[in-house]
UniProtKB/Swiss-Prot annotation:
Function: Golgi membrane protein involved in vesicular trafficking and spindle migration.
Positions bearing carbohydrate: N41
Main location as per UniProt: Golgi
Protein family membership: Belongs to the TVP38/TMEM64 family.
Subcellular location: Golgi apparatus membrane
Name of this protein: Golgi apparatus membrane protein TVP38
Key words, A-Z: Glycoprotein, Golgi apparatus, Membrane, Transmembrane, Transmembrane helix
Membrane topology: Multi-pass membrane protein
Taxonomic superkingdom: Eukaryota
């Protein structure tokens, strides 16, 4: 399902507002179209409803702004996702058994690590998708182990750096088009050119952006060195543990017939995903705060002159 989300972002990102100002964008950090005092006086339930309506409205506006071809692609992906969910529910037992058997068989093959690494390297280049699927597959095969983490982390770092280098050196014009697809990334490009930019890049890497998209888009920002991009990716390698954990729990669910054990595994998957989501959004807002601080510092430096 994560891959379908990545595909939506890749297809939907081609349309963007003509106004490139970060804080005036319809897809910005601050909800400027909501009245602050009205939201402040709402209960937490009313705030959830308000945010839901706002996101639904923004989604409809973005969909209406797409061309017919892109609308058809989004609809196709939505229908495909519904079909996959239906098949998963109906054929759950057979699917789980097949996953367990396949993972056990692949674990015994000497070439499996090499194949996984090559596939992850391949999907590191935009607009290819499949990183989330391959990461979960690594967890299914090797579980929460050092070997699984090493395979996933190493191939992720190498693939990211390789994709970044190719887009920076050979496909820079295409990388610039990628960065213009997302107003947030385009706006923060001015604060990603320092010697310590790897911290900001690491925060971007942990934010909810498609894996391959980030590799190519950041290459379109002038002043970012391959060294800093590589350091940022190394810093974020612990995130691979979440994929391995979820993959291992999925395999455990297929290996047992106990309802209570399956329930525990399912709850642990939900908790792991919840932890990842909370951590991601916490870092997202930390990133927003840091961006505003750097913008303020730059503005103050200009005011001096």
């Amino acid at each position: 399902m994560a891959d379908l989300y990545e595909a939506r972002v890749s297809s939907g990102g081609l349309s963007r507002p003509s106004d490139t100002d970060f804080l005036d964008s319809n897809d910005n950090f601050d909800d400027l179209d909501d009245d602050f005092l009205d939201i402040y006086n709402l209960s937490w339930r009313q705030r959830i409803v308000q945010h839901g309506k706002r996101h639904l409205r923004n989604g409809k506006d973005k969909f209406n702004a797409l061309s017919r071809r892109k609308k058809a692609l989004v609809v196709f992906l939505g229908v495909l996702e519904i079909i996959l969910i239906f098949i998963t529910v109906v054929k759950r037992e057979a699917i789980m058994k097949g996953l367990v058997d396949a993972s056990n068989d692949l674990r015994q093959k000497w070439y499996t690590p090499l194949v996984l690494m090559l596939l992850i390297l391949a999907v590191s280049f935009p607009p290819l998708i499949g990183y989330s699927f391959l990461s979960l597959s690594t967890g299914l095969i090797y579980g929460l182990s050092f070997k699984g983490w090493f395979i996933l982390a190493m191939s992720t770092v190498i693939g990211s750096v390789l994709s970044f280098t190719v887009f920076q050196r050979l496909l820079h014009s295409h990388a610039e088009r990628l960065i213009r697809m997302n107003p947030k990334l385009e706006a923060v490009s001015s604060v990603l050119q320092g010697n310590d930019s790897y911290w900001m890049i690491a925060l971007i890497r942990l934010c909810p952006f498609p894996y391959s998209f980030i590799n190519g888009a950041i290459a379109g920002i002038y002043g970012i060195s391959i060294k800093n991009f590589a350091i940022a990716n190394i810093i974020t390698t612990p995130k691979a543990v979440i994929y391995l954990f979820v993959g291992e729990r999925l395999k455990n669910m297929g290996e047992t017939d106990s309802g209570s054990t399956r329930l525990i595994n399912f709850i642990s998957i939900l908790l792991a995903n919840g932890f990842l989501i909370l951590t991601t959004w916490f870092l997202y807002y930390r990133f927003k705060k840091r961006y505003l601080e750097l913008q303020s510092e730059q503005q103050n430096s200009f005011d001096i002159f």
